[in-house]
């Protein structure tokens, strides 16, 4: 008798299980794949942990350089580059560390006016020392506009 109840339970369970098509079968018919099923219903510690927040958010086009103005430079290299070091020497600029980025032939760039034809085809940077009229800008940081 116990055996017949066990068989009846197995048959009833098998009959109540619905066949779910695989994602491969759905994609073969041109349908989107199903999202993954959550097999474990209780949350784990990683699910309960608070997600990290970004350290900063870009400010919708009003890019502000903390070190100086936005410049568009024809060339940006480290101060130990042979061309850059020669130009710095000719201008009498000394004491620049070898790993500092230096921009050559820089012109001011208005980030607000980028949509109206004011664009930088070379390399946009923020430079802290633009005292040589755009010929040499020292302490540059590359930026993405």
Swiss-Prot record:
Q: Which organism is it from?
A: Ganoderma lucidum (Ling zhi medicinal fungus)
Q: How does it assemble?
A: Self-assembles to form functional amyloid fibrils called rodlets. Self-assembly into fibrillar rodlets occurs spontaneously at hydrophobic:hydrophilic interfaces and the rodlets further associate laterally to form amphipathic monolayers.
| Annotated Pfam families | Hydrophobin
Subcellular location per UniProt equals: Secreted; Secreted, Cell wall
Upregulation: Expression is negatively regulated by areA, an important transcription factor in nitrogen metabolism that contains a GATA zinc finger-binding domain.
In the record, the note on similarity to other proteins reads: Belongs to the fungal hydrophobin family.
Q: Which gene encodes it?
A: hyd1
Stated role: Aerial growth, conidiation, and dispersal of filamentous fungi in the environment rely upon a capability of their secreting small amphipathic proteins called hydrophobins (HPBs) with low sequence identity. Class I can self-assemble into an outermost layer of rodlet bundles on aerial cell surfaces, conferring cellular hydrophobicity that supports fungal growth, development and dispersal; whereas Class II form highly ordered films at water-air interfaces through intermolecular interactions but contribute nothing to the rodlet structure.
Q: List the disulfide bonds.
A: 65-126, 72-120, 73-106, 127-140
Q: Which residues are glycosylated?
A: 80, 129
Observed effect of gene inactivation = Impairs the formation of primordia. Inhibits the mycelial growth on various nitrogen sources. Affects the resistance to heat, oxidative, and osmotic stresses.
Q: Which residues form the signal peptide?
A: 1-19
**Source organism, top-level taxon:** Eukaryota
Name of the protein this chain belongs to:
Class I hydrophobin 1
């Amino acid at each position: 008798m116990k055996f017949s109840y066990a068989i009846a339970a197995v048959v009833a369970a098998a009959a109540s299980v619905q066949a779910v098509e695989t994602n491969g079968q759905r994609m073969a018919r041109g349908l989107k794949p199903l999202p993954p099923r959550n097999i474990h219903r209780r949350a784990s510690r990683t699910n309960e942990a608070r997600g990290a927040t970004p350290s900063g958010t870009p400010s919708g086009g009003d890019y502000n350089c903390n070190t100086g103005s936005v410049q568009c430079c024809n060339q940006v290299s480290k101060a130990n580059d042979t061309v850059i070091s020669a130009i710095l020497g000719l201008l009498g600029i000394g004491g620049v560390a070898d790993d500092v980025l230096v921009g050559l032939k820089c012109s001011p760039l208005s980030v607000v006016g980028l949509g109206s034809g004011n664009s930088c085809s070379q390399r946009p940077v923020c430079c802290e020392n633009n005292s040589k009229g755009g010929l040499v800008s020292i302490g540059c940081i590359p930026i993405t506009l």
